[in-house]
From Swiss-Prot:
Zn(2+) 4 binds at residues 87, 90, 103, 110. This is E3 ubiquitin-protein ligase SRFP1. It is an enzyme of class 2 (transferase). PANTHER family: E3 UBIQUITIN-PROTEIN LIGASE SRFP1, RING FINGER AND CHY ZINC FINGER DOMAIN-CONTAINING PROTEIN 1. Zn(2+) 6 binds at residues 121, 124, 136, 138. Expressed in roots, leaves, nodes and panicles. One of its GO terms (biological process) is protein ubiquitination.
């Protein structure tokens, strides 16, 4: 029995695709002329490391009738919808609309999570959760870098990202792995990732009670990972405190070289 237009349109929904996306078409990569389910499948399979430009895709192959054709949401041969979500700018298809895709004009790509839940930060150059609006430290193009833990490019990564207090970014999964290994400072700038006030007050009290004068070894120089100030302090075994901002997030450095 021949399917009506509505049945034909929805035929095979969520039944085709790859590990990255549910879709009823494959794309022809203009860079190498090979066929892949998506750009991620292409990027994972190339031996020379070249990546597919999503905006350059010109033709797709319907997975229902195997017809190659120009990029469009509906197959012109069999009438099947090749992706319930379709972006003509990104040449992007996905049947899983629960992911709440939206296209950000400023980012120039499609994102997931619902347009109302995100805003585009002009300085950081990416979409962030509305919970971070006016509540994050801006770093220019902070998302257009590799994750400092796994080194995957963050801007168009499929994995969720986390914005640290200092403004640097990493994958949320990598952030949790870092905590499991008792790493509590940014791997890029060494600023603490949590509010350390309570811990530092306790450290001050411990130093005051147990380390008075007994372990002074002259003077030395420290650099503060919070305010970046370099100061000279009494050298201790532990607990060097920044004279500028009172932080203990410091490390020993060589004495500065004074001009002749």
């Amino acid at each position: 029995m021949e399917l009506d237009d509505a049945s034909r349109h929805g035929f095979g929904r969520m039944g085709f695709g790859c590990k990255h996306y549910r879709r009823r078409c494959r794309i022809r990569a203009p860079c190498c002329n090979d066929v892949f389910h998506c750009r991620h499948c292409h990027n994972e399979s190339t031996k020379d490391g070249h990546e597919l430009d999503r905006h350059a895709v010109e033709s797709v192959i319907c997975l229902v009738c195997d017809t190659e054709q120009p990029v469009a949401q509906v197959c012109y041969n069999c009438g099947v919808c090749m992706g319930e979500y379709f972006c003509s700018a990104c040449k992007f298809f996905d049947d899983d609309v629960d992911r709440e895709h939206f296209h950000c004009q400023d980012c120039g790509i499609c994102r997931v999570g619902g347009k109302d839940n995100f805003f585009h930060c002009e300085k950081c150059g990416s979409c962030y959760s509305v919970s971070l609006r006016d509540k994050h430290c801006c770093i220019e193009n902070s998302m257009k870098n590799n994750c400092p833990i796994c080194y995957e490019y963050l801007f168009d990564s499929l994995r969720e990202t986390s914005v640290l207090r200092c403004g640097h970014t990493m994958h949320l999964q990598c952030f949790h792995e870092m905590l499991k290994h008792d790493k509590f400072s940014c791997p890029i700038c060494s600023m603490p990732i949590f509010d350390m006030d309570k811990f530092l007050r306790a450290l001050d009290a411990e130093i005051e009670a147990n380390m008075l004068h007994i372990d002074y070894m002259g003077k030395g120089w420290i650099v503060c990972n919070d305010c970046r100030d370099t100061t000279q302090v009494y050298a201790r075994v532990a607990g060097h405190k920044c004279c500028h901002c009172q932080s203990h997030n410091t490390c020993r450095v060589a004495a500065p070289v004074l001009p002749a």
